[in-house]
From Swiss-Prot:
Organism this protein belongs to: Synechococcus elongatus (strain ATCC 33912 / PCC 7942 / FACHB-805)
PROSITE patterns hit by this protein: CHORISMATE_SYNTHASE_1, CHORISMATE_SYNTHASE_2, CHORISMATE_SYNTHASE_3
Designated name of the protein: Chorismate synthase
GO terms for biological process, alphabetical: amino acid biosynthetic process; aromatic amino acid family biosynthetic process; chorismate biosynthetic process
Pathway stated in the Swiss-Prot or TrEMBL entry: Metabolic intermediate biosynthesis; chorismate biosynthesis; chorismate from D-erythrose 4-phosphate and phosphoenolpyruvate: step 7/7
Regions annotated as coiled coil: none
Length: 362
C-alpha cells in the first residue's frame, strides 16, 4: 500500500536503505521510446550520496540495471524494471535507534502504524527510496521531450535565510550543475556552501526550498476536479522525504495582492496563440495547464538525523537522549533537486498520456 503512483504512466518503488537494493517497476510507458542505462544513470548520479563535500559521505555508485521492458535500447511497452544494488551499508551505526526514536523522523510513526520497522537506514523512509523515482523520472523526462519538447529544470532557491535570485524563464541545467549546491546564483551559491559546511561541523542540519520550472508544457493537461494538475504536482512533491510545503506560481505571496494585481492578463502572440503577460498562476488555471511555464517550489525541512544530542524517548516511553551516528546529509537540498524534477516529470507524463487518451479522438 502506498508504494505506487500514477494512472496511465504508473510506477511502483521497492526496497529499503540497508536491504539488498532499491528500484522501480514502470508500467504504461509507450513502446519504441529510445532509452539507455546511461541516460538513467545521468540522473541517478545527480542524486547519489557522496558526490561532494556538502552531502552524506556514504559512498554508493548507485549503478542502475534495467531488468525488463527494454530491448536493443527501445522500450517494449511492457513493464520496465530497474534495480540499484546497495553496497555501502553500516547498519551498526543505527544500534541506538533500535529503542530510541529520532526526533521528527519516521521511526515513531512507523512503529505506531506497523508495529515493526527496518531500523538500519530508516528502511522505506530513507531517501534511498527515491532512487526508483529518479530512475523512472529519467524515462518520463525523455518521453516528455520526445513527444512535446518539455524541458524540466530544478534548482536550489533557498537554504535557511540565503535566497538565490534565479530567472525560471532562462535558467539552464548547465548553470545548475556548475556548483555543488545546485544554486545557479553565482553570488549566493558560495555562501550556501559555507553555511552547510559550518552547520555540518556542528552536527546540525539545514532546510530550504527547491524551485522547479517545466517549459513548453502543452495546454490542457489536468483532470478537474480532484486530479487538478497542481493538486497532483503537490501530492507528488509532498510525497518526497523531508518535504513540508508546496507552492505554485505566486503561492502564498499571492494572498498579499488584489485581484487586479494578481490576474494574468491575456493577449494573442504573433503566432496566434493565446498567452498571458504575467505568470502568477504558475502555468495552470482551473487545474489545467495553460501553456505557460509551470513554476513550483517545494520546502524541505532540516535533516532530522543529526549528531547533536537531543531529548527523546524509547519505544517503551522512557525519557532518554540521542546523538545520532551514521552518515547523513547536513542539508538535503542539493540532492533533492533531481528528486523534485523526477516527480514533476512523472506527473506531467501521466497527464499527457491521459489527455491523449481522453481528448484526442476528434
Amino acid at each position: 500500500m502506498g508504494s505506487s503512483f500514477g494512472h496511465l504512466f504508473r510506477i511502483s518503488t521497492f526496497g529499503e536503505s540497508h536491504g539488498g537494493g532499491v528500484g522501480v517497476v514502470i508500467d504504461g510507458c509507450p513502446p519504441r521510446l529510445e532509452i539507455s542505462e546511461a541516460e538513467i544513470q545521468f540522473e541517478l548520479d545527480r542524486r547519489r550520496p557522496g558526490q561532494s563535500k556538502i552531502t552524506t559521505p556514504r559512498k554508493e555508485a548507485d549503478q542502475c540495471e534495467i531488468l525488463s521492458g527494454v530491448v536493443d535500447g527501445k522500450t517494449l511497452g511492457t513493464p520496465i524494471a530497474i534495480v540499484v544494488r546497495n553496497k555501502d551499508q553500516r547498519s551498526q551505526d543505527y544500534s541506538e535507534m533500535q529503542v530510541a526514536y529520532r526526533p521528527s523522523h519516521a521511526d515513531a510513526t512507523y512503529d505506531a502504524k506497523y508495529g515493526i520497522r527496518a531500523v538500519a537506514g530508516g528502511g522505506r523512509s530513507s531517501a534511498r527510496e527515491t532512487i526508483g523515482r529518479v530512475a523512472a523520472g529519467a524515462i518520463a523526462k525523455k518521453l516528455l521531450r520526445e513527444i512535446a519538447g518539455v524541458e524540466i529544470v530544478g534548482y536550489v532557491k533557498r537554504i535557511k535565510d540565503l535566497e538565490g535570485q534565479i530567472d525560471p524563464e532562462t535558467v539552464t541545467l548547465e548553470q545548475v550543475e556548475s556548483t555543488i549546491v545546485r544554486c545557479p546564483d553565482e553570488a549566493i551559491a558560495p555562501q550556501m556552501i559555507d553555511l552547510i559546511e559550518a552547520i555540518g561541523r556542528e552536527g546540525d542540519s539545514l532546510g530550504g526550498v527547491v524551485e522547479c520550472v517545466a517549459r513548453r508544457v502543452p495546454r490542457g493537461l489536468g483532470e478537474p476536479v480532484f486530479d487538478k494538475l497542481e493538486a497532483d504536482l503537490a501530492k507528488a512533491c509532498m510525497s518526497l522525504p523531508a518535504t513540508k510545503g508546496f507552492e505554485i506560481g505566486s503561492g502564498f505571496a499571492g494572498t498579499e495582492m488584489t485581484g487586479s494585481e494578481h490576474n494574468d492578463a491575456f493577449y494573442t502572440d504573433e503566432q496566434g496563440q493565446i498567452r498571458t503577460r504575467t505568470n502568477r498562476s504558475g502555468g495552470t488555471q482551473g487545474g489545467i495547464s495553460n501553456g505557460e511555464n509551470i513554476v513550483i517550489r517545494v520546502a524541505f525541512k532540516p535533516t532530522a538525523t543529526i549528531r547533536k544530542e537531543q531529548e527523546t524517548v524509547t519505544n517503551s516511553g522512557e525519557a532518554t537522549t540521542l546523538a545520532a551516528r551514521g552518515r547523513h546529509d547536513p542539508c538535503v537540498l542539493p540532492r533533492a533537486v533531481p528528486m523534485v524534477e523526477a516527480m514533476v516529470a512523472l506527473v506531467l507524463c501521466d497527464h499527457l498520456l491521459r489527455q491523449q487518451a481522453q481528448c484526442s479522438w476528434w
